[in-house]
């Protein structure tokens, strides 16, 4: 199979598998069919032996593990489009969950996340980000592994306690800035983030597997809870992309991708993001395709994505856009101009007329050139539309081989344990010093203590007796006075 069927008008609208790593865009207003389009693409890639990663935000993508139950609406769509090869079926699915509730746990270490993404997660300012950079440098220089949040908290405490010493070597470190980061870490931890950081850390190759019959495994990140923390959601997905870019070897253009990565609600990645962060996203998207990874952004409005990212998305599916405001009109104009024009279509006008499940589609051809834009209906998915059945969900969870691999957290010796030993030793030394000081103080106090009356009388008598004895001795030696 060299192409996948994604839509139909008079003809089948296909996507070239060899061009699937040139990335893509699924855009459109709420309720226009983006989620179903995502599901259809995931199904088609899986059929072709391409593993898929996607996030299930609304709870309606994990149902790809269930076959479609035909209804009148689906049957009518199949008839209208003259689709004869449709077969309701389920697809091989693995469920994952950062919080370890609805899927196998997904973890990363603090070191893997790195200072830039961590600063984004904690929403640090420039000064605080600089302190975090220094923390990672100190960690590297001193062999302090940063695996989980308590490792980072311990290192920050060490930096605050010895700020002047570290400042002389690494640059200015203020206790106030360190304290601000510590407070943000506590807040972050209270949101459940401690579940994400630690070991065993995710091996990305576990996302890149095929079933025994050669179909790509569809990895579904259960994200309905994660999505309530949008910065964590978007930064986590970017971390995954970054790790794929850093770990996978260069392969160039393949017959089909090694993995297709769907980034739903992609606008969150760029919302309030600093320029350096956006630049990193652009770089990762540009370069990860040579690692055999295709990235497909899903968002309501194409203008929510930077032009530098949009320009790299070769396969485009545009559902209806509404133009109620000047910004909406700008989006319609922008979307229409990105397509290779079809003389039979007024793209700017059609975008507002598209029905649910209908889209404007342009994919790259064999030469890597955009095809002329076509108006077509997305094929009905072969898996269930809606929320996954609880019994089937439990079966999928039970059968996930990575539940055992990642189910139990590991807490090996790292920065926290090493620094705790140092803190404990310092406390012992402080206690010994305090005891010695107290003992010395007690001895001196005893010497200065006023004598009692009895002690004074005894001392006087002894002194008098001593003087008398002394005189007797002297007389015995030198002779007494003559009378």
Q: Where do the PLM segments sit?
A:
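Conserved P-loop NTPase motor module
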Residues: 105-111, 122, 317, 350-457
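The conserved Walker
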Residues: 26-30, 273, 302
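N-terminal pre-Walker A segment at the start of P-loop NTPase domains
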Residues: 1-12
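Conserved ATP-driven motor cores of ASCE-family P-loop NTPases powering translocation/secretion/packaging/pilus
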Residues: 40-42, 65-85, 283-367
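Conserved lysine of the Walker
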Residues: 34
């Amino acid at each position: 199979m060299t192409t996948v069927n994604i839509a139909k008008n008079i003809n089948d609208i296909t996507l070239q598998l060899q061009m699937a790593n040139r990335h893509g865009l699924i855009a459109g207003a709420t309720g226009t069919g983006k989620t179903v389009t995502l599901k259809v693409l995931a199904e088609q890639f899986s059929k072709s032996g391409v593993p898929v990663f996607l996030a299930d935000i609304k709870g309606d993508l994990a149902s790809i593990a269930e076959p479609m139950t035909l209804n009148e609406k689906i049957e009518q769509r199949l008839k209208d489009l003259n689709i004869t090869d449709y077969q309701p079926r389920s697809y091989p699915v693995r469920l994952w969950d950062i919080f370890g509730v609805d899927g196998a746990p997904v973890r990363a270490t603090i070191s893997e996340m790195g200072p830039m993404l961590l600063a984004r997660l904690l929403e640090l300012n420039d000064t605080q980000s600089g302190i975090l950079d220094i923390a990672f440098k100190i960690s590297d220089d001193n062999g302090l592994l940063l695996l989980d949040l308590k490792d980072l908290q311990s290192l920050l405490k060490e930096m605050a306690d010895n700020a002047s010493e570290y400042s002389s070597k690494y640059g200015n470190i203020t206790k106030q800035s360190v304290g601000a980061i510590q407070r943000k870490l506590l807040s972050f931890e209270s949101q459940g983030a401690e579940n994400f950081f630690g070991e065993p850390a995710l091996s990305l190759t576990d996302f890149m597997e095929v079933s025994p019959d050669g179909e790509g495994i569809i990895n579904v990140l259960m994200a309905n809870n994660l999505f309530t923390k949008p910065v964590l959601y978007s930064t986590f997905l970017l971390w995954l992309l970054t790790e794929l870019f850093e770990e996978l070897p260069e392969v160039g253009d393949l017959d089909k991708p090694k993995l297709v990565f769907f980034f739903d609600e992609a606008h969150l990645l760029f919302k309030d993001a600093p320029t350096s962060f956006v630049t990193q996203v652009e770089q990762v998207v540009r370069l990860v395709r040579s690692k055999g990874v295709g990235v497909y952004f899903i968002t309501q409005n194409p203008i929510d994505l930077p032009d530098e990212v949009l320009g790299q998305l070769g396969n485009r599916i545009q559902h209806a856009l509404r133009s109620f405001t000047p910004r909406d009109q700008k989006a319609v104009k922008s979307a229409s101009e990105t397509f290779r024009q079809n003389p039979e279509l007024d793209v700017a006008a059609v975008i507002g007329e598209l029905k649910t499940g209908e889209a404007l589609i342009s994919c790259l051809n064999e030469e890597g050139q955009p095809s002329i834009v076509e108006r077509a209906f997305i094929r009905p998915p072969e898996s269930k539309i809606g929320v996954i059945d609880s019994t089937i969900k439990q079966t999928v969870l039970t059968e996930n081989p990575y539940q055992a691999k990642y189910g139990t957290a590991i807490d090996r010796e790292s920065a926290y344990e090493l620094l705790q030993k140092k803190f404990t030793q310092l406390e012992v030394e402080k206690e010994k010093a305090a005891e010695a000081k107290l003992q010395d103080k007690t001895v001196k106090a005893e010497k200065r203590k006023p004598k009692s009356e009895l002690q004074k009388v005894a001392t006087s008598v002894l002194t008098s007796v001593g003087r008398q004895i002394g005189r007797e001795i002297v007389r015995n030696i030198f002779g007494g006075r003559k009378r």
